[in-house]
Amino acid sequence: SADQVRNELQRELGQEASRARTFRDIFEYIDFYINACREGTILNGAGTRLTPGTIRSYLSTKSALRRYAEARHIRLTLESLTLDFYNDFVKYLNEATHSRGRYRPNVIGKFVKNIRTFLRYAFDNNYTLNSDFKRREFKVFQETVETIYLNEDELQLLYDLELPPSQAEVRDAFLVGCYTGLRFSDIGRLQPHHIRFDEGIIVITTQKTNRTIAVPICPKLRSIFARYDNCPPPTQSNQATNRMLKQLCRKAGITSKVYLTEVLGGERQIRCYEKCDLVTTHTARRSFATNAFKNDIPAALIMSATGHTTEANFRRYIR
């Protein structure tokens, strides 16, 4: 009968799974998975090692799962991460708060995406028979986020600030991003040999995509490098830079009112901000793309600098 066939199949699958490694709970498994990523046993889709940013995202997901398990007084295992878990986990995140407020849909979506990644590897390697992550309802949330950019006048205000060295370094590293479109992680990796003054370009292989790009050196960029003996400015951590950027933009007078529609805790609301409070390291990349586009530089040329492979992804950067 169909039941006999199903039971026999489950018995055989169970025997196969029993030969695989077992884990005390989901946290032991995630540690195992992250260590495999760090050692290069698990690679990304391009066949290269996962970036530090991806590892940090995995650790953040692990922390969210631990908070959930503690709040619900439950033990999480590979087998328990079912569709019922998914529904309750999303409900918990929509009701919970963290150090910066309520969880946004894209943050929840990132957690779910990472959980699906963990479960897929476990399923494919016979660490679990749980396949609920494949179900359509186990979906990743995604929201089109309203973001800002700094126009050329605002960049000039920032450029003209008289600052002590430690603050000037933060400002200048940010402006390098505004004038190149490089991600903050790549700005931190910039070395003098990447900067070809004789050719007027920066050539670097990006960390996230492993693509080699060439970016023109504009006059403003050249003058910034000159402040550091024709070397890139030093960078601080992403978190420290984001905190300082808000202060520097306020000092520069970048304080116009910005109204954003946001989803927080599952509720849509309109919130008012001063523009300086919305500036992050990623604002630099959006500012580069948007200002170049508004200056009628062809999208294909801007994409060659930013490393975007599709115009649809690129246009999400335009404000």
Short names for language-model regions:
Residues 149, 206-210, 306-319:
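Catalytic-site neighborhood detector that most strongly recognizes the C-terminal catalytic loop/helix
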Residues 230-235, 246-304:
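Short, basic (Lys/Arg/His-rich) helix/loop patches that form interaction surfaces
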Residues 180, 189-224:
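Conserved tyrosine-mediated DNA breakage-rejoining catalytic core shared by Y-recombinases
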Residues 189-195, 293-295, 303-309, 318-319:
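A short, basic/aromatic helix-end/turn motif that makes direct DNA contacts
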Residues 34-53, 62-146, 160-161:
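N-terminal core-binding DNA-recognition domain of tyrosine recombinases/integrases
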Residues 1-54:
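N-terminal helical hairpins
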Residues 214-227, 304, 316-319:
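DNA/chromatin major-groove-contacting recognition/catalytic segments
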Residues 105, 109-111, 128-184, 188, ...:
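Basic, Lys/Arg- and aromatic-enriched nucleic-acid-binding interface segment
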